[in-house]
Amino acid sequence: WGSASAFADYKVMFINALLMTLLSPRILAKATVAYLIFDSLHLLFEGRPSVLTGIPQWTIALSFTLFLFILDDFARYWLHRWLHAIPLLWSFHKVHHSASALNPFTVFRTHPAEAILFSVRSALVQGISTAVFFFFFGNQVTLVMVLGASIFTFAFNLLGSNLRHSPVSISYWHPIELILMSPAQHHIHHSTAEEHIDRNF
C-alpha cells in the first residue's frame, strides 16, 4: 500500500479518472451501439418475431443477465490477449505490467489508450446485447441485480475477482479454475518468470 509501485498506481488512477471524465462523452456510447443494432435488426427483419412471446419475464431477465456476462467476459478475454500479442497494444498494456508489487489499485494502472479500448469494448458488448434482447423481447428485458451489479458479476467478484491484483493469493478448486480465474492464477499472469509470460489471460 505504501510502496513506490502503489503510489504510481494511485497517480495513474487519478490521471486516468480525469482523462476519462473529459473523454467519456466523446467515446462510443452503448446507447449509440444499441440504437444502430436495433435499427439494423428492423431493416433485416420485417417486424419483431412473434415466436418469442409468452416466455416468463424472469426467464428473459436471467437469460439477458447471463448472456451479457458471458459476452462481456469473452470480449474482455480476447482484448486482453490482443493487448499481449499485438506490439502496438502491448506498448499500452505494459504500463499495467510495470507494477513491481500488486495491490487492489493495480487494476487501475493502465495507459489511457487501454482505458479507451476497454470503454469501447464495453459499449459494444452492452449495446449489442441490449439491442438483440430488446428486439426479440421488447420491454420485458431487465437485469437481475444484487446491490447495483449483475447477479453474475456480483458472484464473480464475491469469489475473489476483486482480489486479482492484491497480494492475497487465493486459489479455487481446480475444476472451478478451468472456468473462472482465481487471484492466484492472475498472480502468475503478472509474474516475470519466463515460463509465466503471456499465460493465464
What does each of the following model-derived ranges do?
Residues 1-9, 32-52:
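Membrane-helix interface linkers and caps
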Residues 14-33, 37-38, 53-201:
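Membrane-embedded catalytic scaffold of the fatty acid hydroxylase/desaturase
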